[in-house]
Amino acid sequence: WYEWKAPRQPYFIRRRDGAPMAMAGLYRLNADHQPAEQSAVIVTRSAVAGLGEVHHRAPLLLGPESLNRWLDPSCPEAVIEAMVLPEDGGELEWYPVSAEVGSVRADYEGLTLRDDRHGQAPPAQMELF
């Protein structure tokens, strides 16, 4: 996922091993099942160590064992609350990427590549004569 650090610097956040991530979410469908009444949210928590320098909160990530518990409506509330305990974030990595990720026109693989140019002065124009 992407998070923005002020002023307008996007960061790409992923698992170090490149594996997919599952995020806890909630979905609500109105009793009459009208599409306009549907809503969904991603559950967030305080950011793990280090990631807080980029943004103060992050999605609640679910591992394979907690994913099944999250999806089980009979799971006790205490078990769900235990999933929100602090993590060390060691399985995550994050780095700056191009500001192009904020444009709906940009859609290419390179958007997740590291880009450390933010805040640097543009290259000086070569002298014409």
Predicted feature descriptions by range:
Residues 1-129:
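A structured binding-face within diverse protein domains that lines the active/interaction site
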